[in-house]
Amino acid sequence: MLETRSGYKSGFISIIGRPNVGKSTFLNRVIGQKIAIMSDKPQTTRNKVQGVLTTTDSQMIFIDTPGIHKPKHKLGDFMLKVAKNTLREVDVIMFMVNAEQKLGKGDEFILEMLAGNSTPVFLVINKIDQIHPDELLGIIESYKERYEFAEIIPISALQGNNVESLLDTLPKYLPEGPQYYPADQVTDHPERFIIYELIREKVLHLTREEIPHSIAVVIDKIRRDEENNDKIHVAATIMVERDSQKGIVIGKRGALLKEVGTRARKDIEMLLGSKVYLELWVKVQKDWRNKSTHLRDFGFRDDEY
């Protein structure tokens, strides 16, 4: 049974927002370790990612959700469902927006979704390092007119500006509760999931156009070498929807796939603390984003959310 220390705060914080506002960058900065995929391409977070930050007097469990948008296929339906489900039974909702972008239809969509909600909502204005300070007041006013936020906090997740102030404020809205996770645990996701995300991140960085949204990764094997315990063999398959996409991911004479492997291997070695032999394959699974069976096979399961 978990013990609750008097005055100790703990709770769950959902991070929501339009695609590409910096939610994963924020989470990785706060946790101090890469656990959420980062890319300049929208819709890169597909599953909710839980990051755990433990201090002497609080434990904050962050849930990074897919960027909220109106879905165009079954995968989009899944991503929106994950985002909505994280709003249930959390203690605080962080609505993150991009200071460089005006309040748009995507933000209105989220504000409508929050209507009638009783959970405290923080408006977190990210990327303030990219605008002139004089612009900030106008941004704040445009959102204040549409929703009664518990707190409005401008930050730069990339540079770290004002992030500590946000982290100091959040526990004030959390209930007293137990320490759910050990102090040194930063995520509840298994290594297999993080390896999957690291490989997909490298593909996103190195490809273009429709390729990113058509990609899934299946981890086929993670096995420690029996003769050399410091070496781990990882085998994974990159799934695409069309033969033309397969050619792009492989690249001329296999150059792009090799670069994906090199970059992913370095991050996986840092994660596991061991030498890694990474074996990558590319396979076509036509129209997988619109087939529920393929979504489940590739790790997108409704019952886990």
Swiss-Prot record:
Residues 207-286 form the KH type-2 domain. Residues 64-67 are annotated as: G3. It is found in: Cytoplasm; Cell membrane. GO terms for cellular component: cytosol; plasma membrane. It comes from the Bacteria. It is a peripheral membrane protein. This is GTPase Era. It comes from Lysinibacillus sphaericus (strain C3-41).
